[in-house]
């Protein structure tokens, strides 16, 4: 149910992850978050890092903030997006050197960066029935939300995406394994929503990527919809669903950005309030797909590129928003990033100014539409050495 963004036009938020401060050099390494917070050094580093990430988003003028996915370890290529939950689930023992089909599907081989990234991932092996472990999403959200008065969006990988980083040696088929994962994640998301988290983002349903595969059928995609919606049953927060075309080590998985065309009708059947799409990387090529779409969902478009270290000019961001408004009403448009910033590839400064560009570009369009603008604290000339 739309709550936080219900009455907001052109609300702004990043996807989730953000580069760590260099001094935050601790990792959970599979430990319980609550147990780690009993260590004075970890508690101080973690809390200060989350505060720094939130402060940067507030200084940039974002309406909604995140904790930067600061629970994730110092790991290769954003590995913890998968492995923060996998390291804490019961039923997984050991690992293998490759993920199922991923390397061959994308033509990876030694000498390519994503080959090394995937080698570092070490997918787990399911030996017993999967069971819930100490994911502690509620505790993570509470620590972050008490550092800000702005609504804090908490994001986590979806169950079907988790399954892609597992070798199944227990279940009769992968579908049964996926449904068990969905039930585990549903319990976690319900607890998080019941604690008061206003926005829960469930990340990377496989529909748009699977739709590209040779032999992929509508029945396959319909099962993914059933599974994805199963993990959202009874979750009372505003639900965002994030989609993109990949972000391992801040790299493109597809050199030529694919289209959402086949996957979009299936994505629109997900039980969410806000659907995000990668848009900056393709210069909004898929926006005309929304011309004839009738939906109550809000659509969040990425207006800055996570795979590019060049900060987009505000006018460039504004132009993409104007293009989106040709197909999506302003009441249903949300402004975001293509994907997260915290996958080894971007510095904090670059990530910060991409946030600033996002908000300043949105402010240009807000002025044109007569909407209230957000204050971008860092853009106030009075606060700089050479200011007036």
Region locations from a protein language model:
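Domain-level signal for soluble alpha/beta catalytic cores
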Residues: 1-388
């Amino acid at each position: 149910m739309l709550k936080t963004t219900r009455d907001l036009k052109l609300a702004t938020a990043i996807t989730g992850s953000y580069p760590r401060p260099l001094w935050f050099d601790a990792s959970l390494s599979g430990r319980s978050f609550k147990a780690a917070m009993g260590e004075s050094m970890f508690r101080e580093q973690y809390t200060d890092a989350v505060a720094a990430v939130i402060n940067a988003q507030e200084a940039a003028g974002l309406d909604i903030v995140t904790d930067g996915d600061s629970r994730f370890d110092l790991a290769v290529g954003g590995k913890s997006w998968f492995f923060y939950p996998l390291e804490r689930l019961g039923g997984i023992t050991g690992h293998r050197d490759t993920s199922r089909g991923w390397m061959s599907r994308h033509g990876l081989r030694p000498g390519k960066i994503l080959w090394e990234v995937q080698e570092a991932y070490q997918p787990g092996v399911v030996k017993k029935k999967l069971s819930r472990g100490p994911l502690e999403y509620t505790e993570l959200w509470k620590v972050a939300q008490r550092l800000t008065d702005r609504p804090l969006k908490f994001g986590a990988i979806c169950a079907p995406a988790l399954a892609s980083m597992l070798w199944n040696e227990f279940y009769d088929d992968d579908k049964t394994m996926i449904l068990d994962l969905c039930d585990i994640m549903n319990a976690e998301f319900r607890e998080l929503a019941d604690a008061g988290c206003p926005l829960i983002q469930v990340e990377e349903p496989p529909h748009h990527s699977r739709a590209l595969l040779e032999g992929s059928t509508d029945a396959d995609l319909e099962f993914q919809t059933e599974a994805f919606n199963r993990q959202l049953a009874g979750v009372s927060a505003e639900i965002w669903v994030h989609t993109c075309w990949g972000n391992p080590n801040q790299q493109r998985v597809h050199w030529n950005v694919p289209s959402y065309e086949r996957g979009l009708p299936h994505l629109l059947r997900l039980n969410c309030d806000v659907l995000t799409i990668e848009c900056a990387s393709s210069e909004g090529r898929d926006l005309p797909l929304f011309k004839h779409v009738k939906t109550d969902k809000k659509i969040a478009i990425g207006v800055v590129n996570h795979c590019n270290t060049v900060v987009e000019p505000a006018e460039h961001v504004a132009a993409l928003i104007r293009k989106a408004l040709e197909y999506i009403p302003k009441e249903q448009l949300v402004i975001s990033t293509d994907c997260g910033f915290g996958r080894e590839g971007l510095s904090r400064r670059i990530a910060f100014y991409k946030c600033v560009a996002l908000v300043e570009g949105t402010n240009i369009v807000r002025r044109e539409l007569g909407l209230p603008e957000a204050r971008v604290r860092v853009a106030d000339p009075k606060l700089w050495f050479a200011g007036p």
